[in-house]
Amino acid sequence: MSPDELCATAERLGVDDARELRKSELVLAVLEAHADRRGETHAEGVLEVLGDGFGFLRNADAMFAPGTDDVYVSPSQIRRFGLRTGDIVRGTVRAPKESERYFALLRVESVEGGAPDQHPHRDDFDARPAGPATTRLDLRGAPPSVRLAELYAPLGLGQRILIKAPPRGGKSGLLGELTRALVANHPTAHVTLVAIDVRPEEAGELGRGLDGHVAVSTLADPPARHVQLVEMLVERGKRTAERGGHAIVVIDSLGRLARAWNLVVPASGRTLIGALDAAAITRVRRLWASARQLESGGALTLVATLTTESGQRIDEVMADELAETASAEWVLAKGGSAEAPRFDVDATFSRQAEALVDDVAAWRHAAAQPVARVTPAAAATADLPSLIAALA
């Protein structure tokens, strides 16, 4: 519902000064007005299950940030219907009583768009067998340098794709262009670029041209918020893959995520180089391992950045810890820019490249040739087979 539609609904329900309220306050006022009239109303949100067993329906438009318009979900409902973090849940809710702060879910009407009783016996995502990536990500429309990097290291659905970049090496521009190409060429996939702990002025730049596909936390947010945002998006991606869909989450960056987790997780007693707790690394590795192509379902693809040559010990530790874990790596070289990133072709690779191209012999030959024969216009608009043919 757009802000104007929300205001119109609020005014129709008799909410005072509706156009002066923030969106979260307006949503809460509309829910309360509905509840006052009928005793109960309906709500839908993305479930976050907390450590004590209860949960809340979060607002996706608010990037899952905790708010006063969240709906409380009891532990008994979560157990009964086998609900998990990331599920889209719809149901009947009631207004908070005097001693309560939140609306409460009375009845679960649907989970992931289906009847709630279909879900208690779902197989756990992490327990499902994974297969090799066989569907190539289509990057037509991306800048020529990105298309040529794709020639050397094709990317596939269900992969763990690591983008290593030095400071000011064009990483931010690359991520934006990459996400735009994924959104344009994979309309049925759920594509989200999530940037955490960024400068406030960067937040608006990242979202330009990517409405609905960007989630951001800024350096003004606490570390727990950075962690929660990334985890919610990855868990939402798992639920999408479980029902046969495809989700692509682009994370900027794993280094900042490790720093945030280092401040959030209980100390394990094992501190590594750079004052990084071993428990924080475990959390990053567990999340990174989530990417996969399910044999009998969809795929969760993770694309993540890692800063190199930054002088920060945490970045060095993460590079060591994640060595050999990526399905593909794109490595940026110094001297690039947001408009024209430069790739270290020798270090850029894809472990499953041969499964992602139709003519393996032609691809091998093309990848060994100089790229000067491909014009920028052709690189940006051609599909991968055409690029291979141009260099064959």
For every predicted segment, state its role.
Residues M1, D17, D36-T92:
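S1/OB-fold single-stranded RNA-binding interface
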Residues R38-G53, A95, S99-P116, V250:
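Glycine/charge-rich, flexible interdomain linkers and switch-proximal surface loops
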Residues L83-T85, P96-I163:
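P-loop NTP-binding catalytic core
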